[in-house]
């Protein structure tokens, strides 16, 4: 099923990815999208959200650094994207960390139909209402079954769920996949998950099957990180960051197919 031709489609189409994202990761996210052939726009003024919805091929909403004006812009943009039939991705950064973040995410989920939600296990557990010891915006630890969390959130909100971790879990509520790729250096650079959300969005902009787009995006991204690590003389985050950007710029269908480790099932067992 996963031939990774979505990766080629991103290069061919160069989708316009509208990011309402956080101040920590905006630059890296924009450069990462440019590296894979997408066209990023980082805009958050509420006055232009309706107009941008008519232009963008996908909208990515990231709650990493919130304020009231930004939340208003997110809601306007999300509703406009729904009207336009544009895919919308939510990255609920640190949703379990504070009551304000939980409130904002619940409001966004109530007002916007999201094509996909991508986060770590702690963030998706918070949305699912499952007990989990999150550590700020990091995943933390918990005993809940990650597949069950993915299934619950996917079915409750009619969306594709992407739970990033040592093994990525992707589900649309009926289909499940695990991606067992990725460099151990990825979690040592800030914003790697936020960029993945944007990359998933760029794949959804050119592939109507959001589940397939998500699996192929996660695998392509993780495999690129492995190639980046191979090129390093020193396995350190400061060296890895630019090398990973280069790996994204030089990724290919052939490279991804050669190393992708995907386990797919039709149901949660």
UniProtKB/Swiss-Prot annotation:
It comes from the Bacteria. Keywords: ATP-binding, Kinase, Magnesium, Metal-binding, Nucleotide-binding, Thiamine biosynthesis, Transferase. GO terms for molecular function: ATP binding; hydroxyethylthiazole kinase activity; magnesium ion binding. Pathway: Cofactor biosynthesis; thiamine diphosphate biosynthesis; 4-methyl-5-(2-phosphoethyl)-thiazole from 5-(2-hydroxyethyl)-4-methylthiazole: step 1/1. Its cofactor is Mg(2+). Gene3D superfamilies: 3.40.1190.20. InterPro entries: Hyethyz_kinase, Ribokinase-like. Its EC number is 2.7.1.50. It catalyses: 5-(2-hydroxyethyl)-4-methylthiazole + ATP = 4-methyl-5-(2-phosphooxyethyl)-thiazole + ADP + H(+). Pfam families: HK. Disulfide bonds: none annotated. Substrate binds at residues 42, 191. ATP binds at residues 118, 164. Catalyzes the phosphorylation of the hydroxyl group of 4-methyl-5-beta-hydroxyethylthiazole (THZ). Belongs to the Thz kinase family. This is Hydroxyethylthiazole kinase. It comes from Listeria monocytogenes serotype 4b (strain CLIP80459). The gene is thiM.
């Amino acid at each position: 099923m996963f031939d990774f031709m979505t990766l080629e489609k991103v290069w061919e189409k160069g989708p316009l990815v509208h990011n309402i994202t956080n101040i920590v990761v905006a630059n890296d996210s924009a450069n990462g999208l440019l590296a894979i052939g997408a066209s990023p726009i980082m805009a958050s003024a509420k006055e232009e959200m309706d107009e941008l919805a008519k232009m963008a091929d996908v909208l990515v909403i990231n709650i990493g650094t919130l304020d009231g004006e930004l939340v208003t812009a997110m809601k306007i943009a999300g509703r406009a994207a729904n009207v336009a039939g544009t895919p919308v991705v939510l990255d609920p950064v640190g949703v379990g960390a504070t009551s304000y973040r939980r409130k904002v995410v619940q409001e966004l989920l109530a007002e916007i139909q999201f094509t996909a939600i991508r986060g770590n296990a702690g963030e998706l557990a918070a949305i699912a209402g499952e007990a989990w010891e999150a550590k700020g915006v990091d995943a933390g630890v918990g005993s809940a079954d990650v597949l069950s969390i993915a299934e619950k959130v996917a079915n409750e909100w009619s969306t594709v769920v992407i739970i990033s971790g040592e093994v990525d879990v992707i589900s649309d509520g009926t289909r499940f996949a695990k991606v067992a790729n990725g460099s151990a250096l990825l979690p040592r650079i800030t914003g790697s998950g936020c960029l993945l959300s944007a990359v998933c969005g760029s794949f959804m902009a050119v592939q109507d099957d959001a589940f397939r787009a998500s699996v192929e995006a996660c695998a392509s991204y993780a495999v690129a990180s492995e190639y980046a690590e191979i090129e390093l003389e020193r396995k350190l985050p400061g060296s890895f960051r630019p090398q990973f950007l280069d790996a994204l710029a030089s990724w290919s269908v052939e490279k991804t197919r050669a190393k992708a480790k995907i386990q797919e099932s039709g149901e949660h067992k």
